[in-house]
């Protein structure tokens, strides 16, 4: 596990606890990288997921762990809502077959909203759909 300045792993997968080789994670790692800007030149080309402070790595580790265990009770306890038959997306992408259809529905909805107003394109970090709720 090689790190640069004790802050960013050369291989982002060293910062990931579960399902390290998932294609969604690889896509995110390839898309969101450090670039030369003067302050962080030493990290140029490395994935943001490799940062020890990466909220996206934290998000992946938590939500993917819950999904793999099929146990969203920590989320249910936090938001006081029962999540029956939960399906999850991270960064609007399905990381398993259960959530594939949800990815297309959410993507279509976002395309109808984004681009019609100034500002950054929407990319929710976490979307969870159950039989009765969309979070």
Residue spans of the language-model regions?
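Charged, terminal alpha-helix-loop-beta segments
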Residues: 1-135
């Amino acid at each position: 596990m090689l790190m640069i300045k004790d802050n960013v792993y050369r291989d982002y997968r060293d910062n990931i606890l579960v399902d390290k080789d998932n294609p969604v994670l690889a896509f995110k790692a390839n898309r969101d990288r450090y670039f030369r800007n003067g302050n962080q030149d030493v990290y140029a080309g490395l994935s943001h997921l490799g940062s020890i402070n990466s909220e996206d790595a934290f998000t992946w580790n938590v939500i993917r762990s819950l999904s793999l265990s099929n146990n969203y009770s920590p989320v249910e306890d936090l938001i006081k809502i029962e999540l029956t038959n939960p399906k999850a997306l991270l960064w609007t992408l399905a990381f398993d077959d259960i959530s594939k259809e949800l990815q297309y529905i959410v993507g279509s909805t976002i395309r109808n909203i984004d681009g019609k107003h100034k500002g950054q394109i929407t990319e929710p970090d976490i979307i969870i759909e159950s039989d009765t709720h969309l979070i």
